């Protein structure tokens, strides 16, 4: 079933709105989006809407395959990105990279 919205931790809101964060790495349960799909974006903590995004593409990627390019698209260093992934998805190897662009804020 396709997602009908997506949430991000509040700490990522500024990076998303500024265009510094252009991908999100998710587990399989949160990977059910399709190219061209438009989603409202809310904060995870309070479910406050802050923008709409359009999905550019979805690509499977393993944790061990993450590079500096992925980190840059997340507006982090590679060690920071790996730490965040370990915090959110402990022990998970298979991720899905969702590339997106902001439509409205």
From Swiss-Prot:
Belongs to the N(4)-acetylcytidine amidohydrolase family. Gene3D superfamilies: Hypothetical protein (2.30.130.30). Its EC number is 3.5.1.135. Signal peptide: none annotated. This is N(4)-acetylcytidine amidohydrolase. PANTHER family: UCP029143 FAMILY PROTEIN (PTHR38088:SF2). The lineage of its organism: Bacteria, Pseudomonadati, Pseudomonadota, Gammaproteobacteria, Alteromonadales. It comes from Shewanella baltica (strain OS185). The active site is at 21 (proton acceptor), 24 (nucleophile), 74 (proton donor). CDD domains: ASCH_yqfb_like. InterPro entries: AC4CH (IPR008314), ASCH_domain (IPR007374), PUA-like_sf (IPR015947). Catalyzes the hydrolysis of N(4)-acetylcytidine (ac4C).
